[in-house]
Every structure is written in structure tokens, then in C-alpha cells.
């Protein structure tokens, strides 16, 4: 059986934690930041955990993670 291919777009967007969960970047921190508060921008700079309902799809895209 051939090796499974990794979806490169997903590999750039998600990282796996030691417990097997996936970390992702938060949205809304790309542009149009003038009217957003410093507190909000600081919060958006942190990583978030991928929801458990989406984790199965992410793991299919990253077979060797």
C-alpha cells in the first residue's frame, strides 16, 4: 500500500500538541486592526485548540501527525 500524502495547506496551519490535540491560529488578526482594542488583538495572537468535532477531519489531512 502506498504512503499517504499529507495535505500541505493543513500542515502549515495546524500543529499537534503532546496530547494529540491540534492547535490553530485565530481569525480576525490580519488587517483592519485600527478599531480593535489592544486587549482583543493580544487575545487573537494566542493559539486556540481545534474543536473536537473538527479534529477528525484535521487528522485525516495530517496522517503522520
Curated annotation (Swiss-Prot):
SUPFAM superfamilies: L35p-like. InterPro entries: Ribosomal_bL35, Ribosomal_bL35-like, Ribosomal_bL35_CS, Ribosomal_bL35_sf. The keyword Ribonucleoprotein applies. GO terms for biological process: translation. GO terms for molecular function: structural constituent of ribosome. Keywords: Ribonucleoprotein, Ribosomal protein. One of its GO terms (cellular component) is cytosolic large ribosomal subunit. It holds the Pfam family Ribosomal_L35p. It comes from the Bacteria. PROSITE patterns: RIBOSOMAL_L35 (PS00936). Gene3D superfamilies: 4.10.410.60. Belongs to the bacterial ribosomal protein bL35 family. This is Large ribosomal subunit protein bL35. It comes from Prochlorococcus marinus (strain MIT 9211). The gene is rpmI.
Amino acid at each position: 500500500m502506498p504512503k499517504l500524502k499529507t495535505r500541505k495547506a493543513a500542515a502549515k496551519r495546524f500543529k499537534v500538541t503532546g496530547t494529540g490535540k491540534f492547535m490553530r491560529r485565530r481569525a480576525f488578526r490580519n488587517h483592519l486592526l485600527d478599531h480593535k482594542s489592544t486587549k482583543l488583538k493580544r487575545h487573537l495572537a494566542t493559539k486556540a485548540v481545534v474543536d473536537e468535532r473538527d479534529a477528525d477531519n484535521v487528522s485525516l489531512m495530517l496522517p503522520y501527525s
